[in-house]
Amino acid sequence: QEPQPEQDPFELSGKWITSYIGSSDLEKIGENAPFQVFMRSIEFDDKESKVYLNFFSKENGICEEFSLIGTKQEGNTYDVNYAGNNKFVVSYASETALIISNINVDEEGDKTIMTGLLGKGTDIEDQDLEKFKEVTRENGIPEENIVNIIERDDCPA
């Protein structure tokens, strides 16, 4: 496998839809869970060292919209406060997919490792899904802990 060229995060900005999420703790991504996240857009602002996230999460079938601002750290890692502290990195990027790896430490101090596959729409290329499964395994998450989020997303576009 050839190493991925360093992506310019600015070029990755735009509309992104959550396709799949993997988690070391399935309760974090299940029904009514905080990380069953329906992403809508990500804007990377290198000048200000910020990232802007817009997404929905559902509780009791009700979609709630979130707009969060994260701060860029060393090594293209971003810190975002949401259901605890999160450190995420873009593990892989193509024109049609983003794969994000996230470490969440919740209010109780419990650590959860998550991966997300985001697409420009609801169709995901086979090679992007395979790459996502590979990144998920590399993060120590078993394949049975991957959830199809597209099928659950009925929040506003």
UniProtKB/Swiss-Prot annotation:
One of its GO terms (cellular component) is extracellular space. Disulfide bonds join C63-C155. One of its GO terms (biological process) is sensory perception of smell. InterPro entries: Calycin, Lipocalin, Lipocln_cytosolic_FA-bd_dom, OBP-like. Its main location: secreted. Belongs to the calycin superfamily. Lipocalin family. This is Odorant-binding protein. It comes from Sus scrofa.
